[in-house]
């Protein structure tokens, strides 16, 4: 037989034997997870995700208010509910009722509130389901994550919660969060990166301080903290005293004050003595000044003594000196005038004059830099990144923020 034909037949034979093997190798490669980046959990801040409500109320505060609904509707954020007169209905539905005996809050009679979209991102991408720009929150960040290869509801998920309440009343949330993190670890073959904003950082600190170190080492790759109020926020005293409409002209500060006071998380975010001087005056009035040692008298003088009980219930929820025990990245805005103290001529029912300090417009620099203290208190790396001129909400879409996050997730230089 021609030697050339023999060689060809031998090659064909070997190819025939190799082809099934190569095919199996290719299929095996396809079966391997395509995941090359860590899964991400996004945790919003105060007011930072949608809430839904269903009504079956014994009475209403105005004849224009709905007494009963057949299904759940958007309670937050729905701009149509913030119109004059209608806002009275909204406040009566979204407020919490504090029980001094149980030291917990309840929904008003006939109101059921739920948090939509746990594990999804929609309820924190846009606070208003109509996706108006005014309600845009995590949208730009999630879009960036998608551009880096992530998929909504799969390897990037949201962890929304009832932000009116402090962690001590949201026990089921933390169980669900732990289960979701463990599930994502199993599905995507590695630990999770937590990305939290504002009060969401306090929620995550509470969560991490209660996890065994072995659990954190296995399931958490890093914690990216954006605008964290570690030491509380000075503007909280103004919110409690005279209300804060966040510059929304159709909402009167005194009108919104009832809802803001009823949220336990508001009192939880008062300034803490581990960050602020005991001598610092936050509120000046013609008859009295208030430091953080004067909270009891402050609540008495504004006519809201439930707030003092709320503060007592929540002030020990996170331990200032106990670090999270995971790799931590603290990003914070500077150079934006941030309320630091308040001067009232008519206390507490008139807007104050405001003295400003440094920060991101909401969180004071003194508070967010609390994470510096953890650099010497944990083995895991603690990194800080200043965002000059970055406002509290805008930092989520800040180019420096997104570039930093991309480096953490994709381990780019």
UniProtKB/Swiss-Prot annotation:
Regulation: Transacylase activity is inhibited by MJ33.
Residues that coordinate or bind Zn(2+): 198, 355, 392
Name of this protein: Lysosomal phospholipase A and acyltransferase
Catalysed reactions, as listed in the record: a 1,2-diacyl-sn-glycero-3-phosphocholine + H2O = a 2-acyl-sn-glycero-3-phosphocholine + a fatty acid + H(+); 1,2-dihexadecanoyl-sn-glycero-3-phosphocholine + H2O = 2-hexadecanoyl-sn-glycero-3-phosphocholine + hexadecanoate + H(+); 1-hexadecanoyl-2-(9Z-octadecenoyl)-sn-glycero-3-phosphocholine + H2O = 2-(9Z-octadecenoyl)-sn-glycero-3-phosphocholine + hexadecanoate + H(+); 1,2-di-(9Z-octadecenoyl)-sn-glycero-3-phosphocholine + H2O = 2-(9Z-octadecenoyl)-sn-glycero-3-phosphocholine + (9Z)-octadecenoate + H(+)
pH dependence of function: Optimum pH is 4.5.
Top-level taxon: Eukaryota
Cell compartments where the protein resides: Lysosome; Secreted; Membrane
């Amino acid at each position: 037989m021609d030697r050339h034909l023999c060689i060809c037949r031998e090659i064909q034979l070997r190819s025939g034997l190799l082809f099934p093997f190569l095919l199996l190798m290719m299929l095996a490669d396809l079966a391997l997870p395509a995941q090359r980046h860590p899964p991400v959990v996004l945790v919003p801040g105060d007011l930072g995700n949608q809430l839904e409500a269903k009504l079956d109320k014994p009475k209403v505060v105005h004849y224009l208010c709905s007494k009963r609904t057949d299904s759940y509707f958007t309670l937050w954020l729905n701009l149509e509910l913030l119109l004059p007169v209608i806002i009275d209905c909204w406040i009566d539905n979204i407020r919490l009722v504090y029980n001094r005996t149980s030291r917990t809050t309840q929904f008003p009679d006939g109101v059921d509130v739920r948090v939509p979209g746990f594990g999804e991102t929609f309820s924190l991408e846009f606070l208003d389901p109509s996706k108006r720009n005014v309600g845009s929150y995590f949208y730009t960040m999630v879009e960036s994550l998608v551009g880096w290869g992530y998929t909504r509801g799969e390897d990037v998920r949201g962890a929304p919660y009832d932000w009116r309440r402090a962690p001590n009343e949201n026990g089921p949330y933390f169980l669900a969060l732990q289960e979701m993190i463990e599930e994502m670890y199993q599905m995507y073959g590695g630990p999770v990166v937590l990305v939290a904003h504002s009060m969401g950082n306090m929620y995550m600190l509470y969560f991490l301080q209660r996890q065994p170190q072995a659990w954190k080492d296995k399931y958490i790759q890093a914690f990216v903290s954006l605008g964290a109020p570690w030491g509380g926020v000075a503007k909280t005293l103004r919110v409690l005293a005279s209300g804060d409409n966040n510059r929304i002209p159709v909402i009167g500060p005194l009108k919104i004050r009832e809802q803001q006071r009823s949220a336990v998380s508001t009192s939880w975010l008062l300034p803490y003595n581990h960050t602020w001087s005991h001598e610092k005056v936050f509120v000046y009035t013609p008859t009295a000044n208030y430091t953080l040692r004067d909270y009891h008298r402050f609540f008495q003088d504004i006519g809201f003594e439930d707030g003092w009980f709320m503060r007592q219930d929540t002030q020990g929820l996170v331990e200032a000196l106990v670090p999270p025990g995971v790799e931590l990245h603290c990003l914070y805005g500077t150079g934006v005038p941030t309320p630091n103290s308040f001067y009232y001529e008519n206390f507490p029912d008139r807007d104050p004059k405001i003295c400003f300090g440094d920060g991101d417009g909401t969180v004071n620099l003194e508070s967010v830099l609390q994470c510096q203290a953890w650099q010497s208190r944990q083995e895991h790396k603690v990194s800080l990144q200043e965002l000059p001129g970055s406002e509290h909400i805008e930092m989520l879409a800040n180019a420096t923020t997104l570039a930093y996050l991309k480096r953490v997730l994709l381990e780019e230089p």
